[in-house]
């Protein structure tokens, strides 16, 4: 009986060797979508260096991903000493990669408001109405609200 138990334990151990050799799979590399989610959290908490790290990794991993460039634009617009020229470049790249990217239209419009160009923001609002098919999508509502606040502050 003792020999049988020893054999059983040995067989179970040997059966798990490939899994042990593969290492701990719980430490896998984050996907670009996960990096963008993390970057947004870091931006929201003003952890600019971590946001920049995640975005740098994301753009290296998927250089043709419109969501990556949209988030880069958001980062460059929101960080201290906003870099609007870089934000415009990022948003325009997102729209080049995906002309129907609604968030890029919204955020580019908000960047134009920061640059005191409300007419450009209103053009993007009109684009959003077409892309959304109505005035009820979140991106349209957010940009419309930002334009209204901008005009009220004038």
Predicted regions and their residues:
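Alpha-helical segment of the N-proximal tetratricopeptide repeat
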Residues: 30-60
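Canonical tetratricopeptide repeat
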Residues: 71-72, 107, 143-146
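Helix-start (N-cap) detector for alpha-helical repeat units in TPR-like alpha-solenoids
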Residues: 32, 66-67, 102-103, 136
């Amino acid at each position: 009986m003792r020999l049988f138990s020893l054999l059983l334990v040995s067989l179970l151990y040997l059966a798990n060797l490939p899994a042990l050799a593969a290492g701990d799979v719980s430490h896998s590399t984050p996907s670009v979508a996960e990096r963008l989610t993390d970057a947004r959290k870091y931006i929201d908490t003003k952890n600019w260096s971590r946001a920049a790290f995640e975005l740098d990794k994301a753009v290296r991993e998927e250089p043709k991903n419109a969501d990556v460039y949209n988030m880069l634009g958001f980062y460059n617009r929101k960080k201290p000493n906003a870099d609007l020229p870089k934000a415009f470049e990022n948003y325009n790249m997102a729209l080049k990669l995906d002309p129907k990217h609604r968030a890029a239209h919204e955020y580019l419009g908000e960047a134009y408001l920061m640059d005191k160009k409300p007419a450009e923001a209103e053009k993007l609002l009109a684009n959003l109405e077409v892309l959304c098919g109505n005035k009820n999508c979140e991106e349209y509502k957010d940009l419309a609200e930002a334009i209204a606040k901008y005009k009220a502050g004038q």
